Design a protein with these regions (language model features):
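Extracytoplasmic ligand-binding site segments that recognize negatively charged/polar headgroups
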Residues: 45-49, 74, 89-92, 96-220, ...
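Extracellular/periplasmic bilobal clamshell ligand-binding domains
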Residues: 311-349
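A ligand-binding cleft/hinge motif common to bilobed small-molecule-binding domains
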Residues: 100-104, 224-225, 229-247
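Early extracytoplasmic/lumenal segment of secretory-pathway proteins
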Residues: 7, 21-104
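Periplasmic-binding protein-like
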Residues: 139, 171-177, 201-206, 212, 244-268, 284-307, ...
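A bilobed periplasmic-binding-protein/Venus flytrap-type ligand-binding module shared by bacterial periplasmic
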Residues: 144-149, 261-274, 293-294
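Short beta-strand->loop
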Residues: 112-118, 132-134, 161, 246-258, ...
């Protein structure tokens, strides 16, 4: 708990430093209406609250407006295809989305390579080998454990294998049918272990699951309230409850875990001016300033940049991420979810 308290204190200090600096810079132009020197368009599949917090912070500091357009993954690919087929440079300059979408866009030729000093600092596992995209954040699946359970049990499950072997434990998790981050865990385990072993792990875990929740935050709240002993949850939601002083400790599966990785790519056929502005913004997303902008709105995504203070002071920075990418077609995903329903959730011997 002390490690997370230090994380929160340091984040608060960083927020104060940025706030003081911003207040000083804005005092000279107080009363004057500011107009952005430039603006460009970015496609994103992230929640509007996240993109809005980033855009507001960036425009306030650099007077450049990022016009985010929220779209689904398929809609983004459709827009990029149309832009790629156009005869002139127009439309979006940046894509801010999950790794799978960026990989698909790169293969289709909808992105152009971008190399920078900031991007070079990111581990190879978080970026495209030919630099068509660079990861900026990741949100892993972790074990959120109630502190009372910790005090009464010595054999803490710190791996999927151990969790599957536990008997005296109440588990909470989000329904694989309810959220992409949750179903991504199932697909990732299948990609990493194979179908047989992945389903066997979940068959053993199933009897201890008290409830499948609809939302990502619900299992974390249940662990904090003592309604379950351990929840399988996304770290971003877990850190929100840790920040609110819920009695939760985070355990990172030592045998690996899934993570949603978010990154940036520069769109093909963006104008040279917009592409350059998008590159500068993409680099800014790899800074502590961007992390502070997110933390001020209670978004706790982990940065991929090891040179930032945010990364260096976080205790879970060495978490092991599954190596194999969970890329399945929509039809394959439907089949896997249907099998999970029949062979795990509602399976009767």
């Amino acid at each position: 708990m002390k490690r997370y308290a230090l994380f929160i204190v340091m984040a608060a200090l960083l927020v104060m430093m940025i706030a003081v600096g911003s207040a000083y810079l804005s005092s000279a132009s107080r009363g004057e209406e500011r107009h952005p020197m430039q603006e460009f368009t970015a496609y994103t599949s992230l929640p509007a609250e996240i993109s809005a917090s980033l855009a507001e912070a960036y425009e306030s500091e650099y007077n450049i407006r990022v016009h985010f357009i929220q779209l689904s993954s398929e809609q983004i690919l459709k827009r990029l295809r149309e832009q790629s087929d156009a005869e002139q440079n127009t439309n979006a300059a940046l894509v801010l989305a999950d790794r799978e979408l960026l990989d698909r866009a790169a293969v289709a030729g909808y992105l152009v390579p971008y190399i920078s000093e900031k991007g070079d600092q990111v581990a190879e596992s978080f970026r495209h080998p030919n630099r068509y995209w660079t990861g900026v954040w990741y949100d892993p699946i972790v074990f959120a454990v109630n502190q009372d359970y910790l005090r009464t049990h010595l054999d803490l499950p710190n791996s999927w294998q151990m969790l599957a072997q536990q008997h005296d434990i109440r588990i909470g998790t989000t329904d694989f049918m309810a959220a992409d981050a949750s179903s991504n865990l199932l697909y990732s385990m299948i990609a990493e272990y194979g179908e047989q072993r992945a389903f066997e792990i979940w068959r053993r875990i199933q009897p201890n699951i008290m409830q499948y929740s609809k939302y990502l935050h619900t299992p974390v709240r249940q662990a904090g309230m003592g309604e379950v002993d351990l929840s399988v949850a996304v770290l971003s939601e877990t850190l929100r409850y840790v920040h609110d002083d819920y009695p939760i400790r985070v355990l990172y599966p030592v045998d690996g875990t899934s993570a949603v990785i978010y990154g940036t790519g520069i769109a093909f056929r963006a104008s040279e001016r917009d592409a350059h502005a998008a590159e500068v913004f993409a680099d800014w997303l790899l800074t502590d300033e961007a992390q502070i902008a997110l933390a001020q709105r209670r978004f706790y995504l982990l940065t991929t940049n090891p040179m930032t203070l945010s990364y260096q002071m976080f205790a879970g920075k060495n978490i092991s991420i599954f190596r194999h990418r969970p890329y399945f077609s929509k039809e394959e995903k439907d089949i896997l979810l249907d099998r999970w329903i029949k062979e795990v959730r509602f399976y009767e011997e």
